Amino acid sequence: MNQTVKVKKKKKTITLGVVHIRASFNNTIVTFTDIQGNTISSASAGGNGFKGARKATPYAAQVTIDRASEKAKEYGLKTISIRIGGPGAQRESAMRALFGQNFVVTSILDVSSIAHNGVRPPKRRRV
């Protein structure tokens, strides 16, 4: 009888990383990357079971941070730099959830894009 031996794939350990938080009006997307920008883990409020208007709530952002950080901690991530962007109301709760995950935060950077009157906004909604 031939026996096959499964070789376990080694997970690379990453101690320093960047957290990208995109808080839009409709959803929250969280991505953990290494310094070069390679994705370690990512999660979104819609992918965590929140649908419709509940995706844009602060609680959904908190759950999203928790799920993404659990996956990132499996790689040994300890020190993070935070890049947060977007106009959403869930920015503060996402930050608080990150501070509760016992990461060492080196910097917080706001990367929200600011329009210089480039694109015409959509027409007013009539209900």
Curated annotation (Swiss-Prot):
SUPFAM superfamilies: Translational machinery components
Gene Ontology CC annotations of this record: ribonucleoprotein complex; ribosome
Mitochondrion recorded as keyword: no
GO molecular function, one term: structural constituent of ribosome
Keyword tags: Ribonucleoprotein, Ribosomal protein, RNA-binding, rRNA-binding
GO biological process, one term: translation
Family statement: Belongs to the universal ribosomal protein uS11 family.
Function recorded in the entry: Located on the platform of the 30S subunit, it bridges several disparate RNA helices of the 16S rRNA. Forms part of the Shine-Dalgarno cleft in the 70S ribosome.
Subunit: Part of the 30S ribosomal subunit. Interacts with proteins S7 and S18. Binds to IF-3.
This protein's name: Small ribosomal subunit protein uS11
Organism: Rickettsia peacockii (strain Rustic)
